UniProtKB/Swiss-Prot annotation:
This is Beta-galactosidase 12. It catalyses: Hydrolysis of terminal non-reducing beta-D-galactose residues in beta-D-galactosides. The gene is BGAL12. Its main location: secreted. InterPro entries: BetaGal_gal-bd, Galactose-bd-like_sf, GHD, Gly_Hdrlase_35_cat, Glyco_hydro_35_CS, Glycoside_Hdrlase_35, Glycoside_hydrolase_SF. The lineage of its organism: Eukaryota, Viridiplantae, Streptophyta, Embryophyta, Tracheophyta. It is found in: Secreted, Extracellular space, Apoplast. Keywords: Apoplast, Glycoprotein, Glycosidase, Hydrolase, Secreted, Signal. Glycans are attached at residues 255, 380, 450. It comes from Arabidopsis thaliana. PROSITE patterns: GLYCOSYL_HYDROL_F35. Residues 1-27 form the signal peptide.
């Protein structure tokens, strides 16, 4: 009995899948106008971003296997310079930063790698991936025709390429790396800075080509990429993108599966129907490489998040922050990938013929001697359409594409979701793990304390801390004469200007108030009347960084901390300008200096317990221990009763918490139909931008796990709980 088309198609798909497993064999990687070519075969490549430092090494095999099961061919990752070179010439490639291990795990799964060396990454990552020490190299100007910058970035790029070659990880060596990226979204920066930017683009392309990796280089959002470099598209939609040369394939390096969450912002999400539509439209217009940014977003552990970026980098990705499939997105895209692979022979062999089927409907047909594939599109956002194609009628929902791998049978429609979300809704379930908290109150320093230094005027925060801590103290004394009239009248007004990001003001050891900025407006002004007495008053300003900016120009000019003006209004003489007074400075908190987040450090201070535990007090450390819950479900801390600070598990920093920063925005009913933007579909409005904070299971011991919380604002520790993420 003969095989029908569907049976033949699935056999072909199986052959293609098997061929993708052969990653240990040396292969030649080239390209033409249609596609990337691996060993002489044009390929439609489906890729997903998974950033190795945003998950633990123990999570990597499962994440990559799920990506493979979801129909991906390629794993894409940035290389994170500041994680790998924390000090000049001192390199780190261990634990979450073990890049070689990550790539080998991908290879073992039978997938390819797209390595985005950059080394600028953006990625909502602290300082865009640049090491902070780079800012203080003499003569440094970032990302332009500047010799100190070019020397540093070339040295690091060469270091990474050399490592990859030594481990034989490029495809031409039998490894999985089929593509590399130099720079990142540089086109808009080049346009802004002009001629030096153009010179830098030319230089960086020539430098990359000179490294002889044997695989193609790409530059994303770089319309003037040289002929030897493939320019690619980033965005929510890229069907109208065209490379700058007829001999380059149409590639999409970032199809945004959702959007990042910022502290103070609502949580964005992107409907599965829309992202599937974006992929189908790109393919039907001749696209041959698609990468989902992100396929798994993960977590901004430690202090790796960019300015005001939440600790969760979930991104509404097909695999959620904890590595679990997000439905229906994961399965809906998995089905799409299978159907695209059925169309692959036609897609790589022919250009589409486009035919109108109605006012907002059209057919894109790929036909070769041995294959035919059709994409039927309905761009109407509100009305379904019945279209006639090839002598048959097809019903197309609004804002959708139907795919016919044999030009006859509809195998898939982007708006027809076959997975019921209600049956697999994920939620946080209490583990009933008991906590018994102890507290340690941080001391408020004074201007003459040990460990301080003094100078006239205000200093920029990061130039002193070098981003080794979020915290920096500005200290001075305010001497008030007994004849000041405000002592028997209205309190004076203290006004403080800061470049960001948050500020706690203490007067005579007591919290007088707090101010903080936002991602949109990181600069802040504290303006509040304060209580002063005759004699010497102690003013202590704790400036808090909430990540460093990750996008923009002239990184060397960016500032953080209290830069003024600082004024006191309401004194007898009118206003005192305190900006140029003598100030004392102190780096970090006492608890950090004592390493109270570690087991050894926590034993060096006295913890109050029982009824003496401080509650709703600023600058308080909390300590408890707990046993690991049974099972293997992912775990998180519910921090909804706390304000702002950081958390550690067994000495490892799980990130910044800031549940007291509630989400702005209007969360309204969101339709999949119509052009998507990052502000279209929102959740969590009026609630914490982030309530739950991932606790990796691999960081836990069976018993007696140490949890430490630094609370800046004041919170209720008894409300903290350990929860597990599981299906409803």
């Amino acid at each position: 009995m003969g095989l029908n088309f569907r049976e033949k198609a699935w056999i072909l798909l199986g052959i293609l899948c098997c061929s993708s497993l052969i990653c240990s064999v040396k292969a030649i990687v080239t390209y033409d106008r249609k596609a990337v070519i691996i060993n002489g075969q044009r390929r439609i490549l489906l890729s997903g971003s998974i950033h190795y430092p945003r998950s633990t090494p123990e999570m990597w095999p499962d994440l990559i296997q799920k990506a493979k099961d979801g129909g991906l061919d390629v794993i894409q990752t940035y290389v994170f310079w500041n994680g790998h070179e924390p000090s000049p010439g001192q390199y780190y490639f261990e634990d979450r930063y073990d890049l070689v291990k990550f790539i080998k795990v991908v290879q073992q799964a039978g997938l390819y790698v797209h390595l985005r060396i950059g080394p600028y990454v953006c990625a909502e990552w602290n300082f865009g991936g640049f090491p902070v020490w780079l800012k203080y190299v003499p003569g440094m100007v970032f990302r332009t025709d500047n010799e100190p910058f070019k020397a540093a970035m070339q040295k690091f790029t060469e270091k990474i390429v050399r490592m990859m070659k030594e481990e034989k990880l490029f495809e031409t060596q039998g490894g999985p790396i089929i593509l590399s990226q130099i720079e990142n979204e540089y086109g808009p920066i080049e346009w802004e800075i002009g001629a030096p930017g153009k010179a830098y683009t030319k230089w960086v392309a020539e430098m990359a080509q000179g490294l002889s990796t044997g695989v193609p280089w790409i530059m994303c959002k770089q319309d003037d990429a040289p002929n030897s470099i493939i320019n690619t598209c980033n965005g929510f939609y890229c069907e109208n993108f065209k490379p700058n040369s007829d001999n380059k394939p149409k590639m999409w390096t970032e199809n945004w599966t959702g959007w990042f969450t910022e502290f103070g912002g609502a949580v964005p999400y992107r409907p599965a129907e829309d992202i599937a539509l974006s992929v189908a439209r790109f393919i039907q217009n001749g696209g041959s490489f698609i990468n989902y940014y992100m396929y798994h977003g993960g977590t901004n552990f430690d202090r790796t998040a960019g300015e005001f970026i939440a600790t969760s980098y979930d991104y509404d990705a097909p695999l959620d922050e904890y590595g679990l499939p997000r439905e229906p997105k994961y399965s809906h895209l998995k089905r799409l990938h299978k159907v695209i692979k059925l169309c692959e022979p036609a897609l790589v062999s022919a250009d589409p013929t486009v035919t109108s089927l109605g006012d907002k409907q059209e057919a894109h047909v790929f036909k070769s001697k041995s294959s035919c594939a059709a994409f039927l599109s309905n761009y109407n956002t509100s009305s379904a359409a019945r279209v006639l194609f090839g002598g048959s009628t097809y019903d197309l929902p609004p804002w959708s594409v139907s795919i016919l791998p044999d030009c006859k049978t509809e195998y898939y429609n982007t708006a027809k979701v076959q997975v019921r979300t209600s049956s697999i809704h994920m939620k946080m379930v209490p583990t009933n793990t008991p906590f018994s908290w102890g507290s340690y109150n941080e001391e408020i320093p004074s201007a003459n304390d040990n460990g301080t230094f003094s100078q006239d005027g205000l200093v920029e925060q990061i130039s002193i801390t070098r981003d080794k801590t979020d915290y920096f103290w500005y200290l001075t004394d305010i001497t008030i004469s007994p004849d000041e009239k405000f002592l028997t009248g209205e309190d004076p007004l203290l006004t403080i200007g800061s470049a960001g990001h948050a500020l706690h003001v203490f007067v005579n050891g007591q919290l007088a108030g707090t101010a903080y900025g936002s991602l949109e407006k990181p600069k802040l002004t504290f303006s509040q009347k304060i209580k002063l007495h005759a004699g010497v008053n102690k003013l202590a300003l704790l400036s808090t960084a909430a990540g460093l900016p990750n996008v923009g120009v002239h990184y060397e000019t960016w500032n953080t901390g209290v830069l003024g003006p600082v004024t006191l209004n309401g004194v007898n003489s009118g206003t005192w300008d305190m900006t140029k007074w003598k100030w004392s400075y102190k780096i970090g908190t006492k608890g950090e200096a004592l390493s109270v987040h570690t087991l050894a450090g926590s034993s060096t201070v006295e913890w109050k317990e029982g009824s003496l535990v401080a509650k709703k007090q600023p600058l308080t450390w909390y300590k408890s221990t707990f046993d690991s819950p049974t099972g293997n479900e992912p775990l998180a801390l519910d921090m909804n009763t706390m304000g702002k600070g950081q958390m550690w598990i067994n000495g490892q920093n799980i990130g910044r918490h800031w549940p007291a920063y509630t989400a702005r925005g209007k969360c309204e009913r969101c339709s999949y139909a119509g052009t998507f933007t990052e502000k279209k579909c929102l959740s969590n409005c009026g609630e914490a931008s982030q309530r739950w904070y991932h606790v990796p299971r691999s960081w836990l011991k069976p018993t007696n796990n140490l949890v430490i919380v630094l609370e800046e604002w004041g919170g209720e520790p008894n409300g903290i709980s350990l929860v597990k993420r599981t299906a409803k």
